[in-house]
Amino acid sequence: MIQYKVLIPEISLLILAIISFFYGFISRNYRTTYILSFLSILTAIILSVFNFGQKEFTSELIKIDLYRQTLRILVLFIGVFIIGLSYSDLKLKSSKSVEYVFLLLLSLFGMNLMIVANDLLILYLALETFSLSLYILAGFYRKESLSIEAGMKYFILGTLSSIILLGSIVFFYAQTGSTSYETFKLLKTENLNILLGVVFLISAFAFKLSLAPFHAWAPDVYQGAPTAVTAFLSTAPKVAVFGALINIFLSINLKLNIQDLIVIISALSMLVGNVLALRQNNLKRMLAYSSIAHAGYMFMAFLLPEKELLISLIPYLIVYVFMNLSAFAFIMNIKNGESIQNYLGVGRKNPLLSFCIIVIMFSLTGVPPTAGFIVKFNLFKNLLSYGYGSLVFFALLMSIFSAFYYLRPVFYLYKDSLVIDIYNHPLNNSMALSGALLLIFLGLFPNLLLIF
């Protein structure tokens, strides 16, 4: 039986989302809509913080512990950041802002429910809740062909991944007679149903994580979606899906023979993401391929035992979120900021904004003393201690290779005189600067990250 008090943050978020939707629908005041949505997420964060560190709760449907609490708070912080980015986008300050904000809040509810799910059916319902919202958000600019294409492509391929996930649930149910993760702990021997269930599950989740070879949707969707939505797509679903994948992997006590599959998907994602990013002149497409590569790095953590998995993956997820959100805040400060060529001379015009993108790109590459270096070093060290030297060497080569495309925007900052306008969005400026400073701070004080 569920004790609903452990789900108060999610329940409050859903109720407040509905209230803000009807209020916004009546008033049609975009400013009020964004304020109400911000307060809704803030309320959920406060309630989650009050529950943080409390006794672990487990039922057949829901499980709450320290790392799940951390991830649900992280998702909510992403929501706050996205509300700020969306508020500065003139195209989202319209009569449709009510629907936009409601879909955003609904997707946050689904993601947090997915993180705490302890049952495959709850997981599936949660995934569909946030996926359906994201399909609409990706195509929210209905007058722009790229946005419509992004929404349709994401919807069609996302539906396929949902079908694969249902297949995974069937295999697990056929073996255990239940969809609860708790029954997975009772399994004594590995068999074909369990192995196929895990493989189908990884395949379905690999789509949401944009892992190769399930990555084809990412560049077009990232480019066509509104920039604030792209920032959301590149971060929040990864936190939710990686959280769910951790939950399932830790629930299955069997030693599954899928290490080779994890190695292949990780290596292929790093290779595809880094090599194809080198050809991109559109920064949103470049960050799409970057997210494929980083998903590959993070997926390697599933080769590790429980403790090392958590202390490797959770800090990486936190840093990855701040790197990406800060990068998109920077993009939204430059007129036509998707094109790298438009950064010519920005370094001379706005040194503070240039400092932000330099720190962000260094952190994405993994250059010390940024937090990006700390989490990569921590992951590689743990993998080395368990005998994955060849994979770590390949990942290190890919990290070095990534410098060639991450540093291209930095090169353009000081190449010529300014040829494009810089928007003066105080909110975006402060978010980009806060993210950059946080990446340096966590790089200098890594113990704050490695608390798991």
UniProtKB/Swiss-Prot annotation:
The chain crosses the membrane at residues 6-26, 33-53, 70-90, 97-117, 120-140, 154-174, 194-214, 232-252, 258-278, 286-306, 311-331, 355-375, 387-407, 432-452. The keyword Transmembrane applies. GO terms for biological process: ATP synthesis coupled electron transport. Its EC number is 7.1.1.-. It catalyses: a quinone + NADH + 5 H(+)(in) = a quinol + NAD(+) + 4 H(+)(out). HAMAP family: NDH1_NuoN_1 (MF_00445). This is NADH-quinone oxidoreductase subunit N 2. The lineage of its organism: Bacteria, Pseudomonadati, Nitrospirota, Thermodesulfovibrionia, Thermodesulfovibrionales.
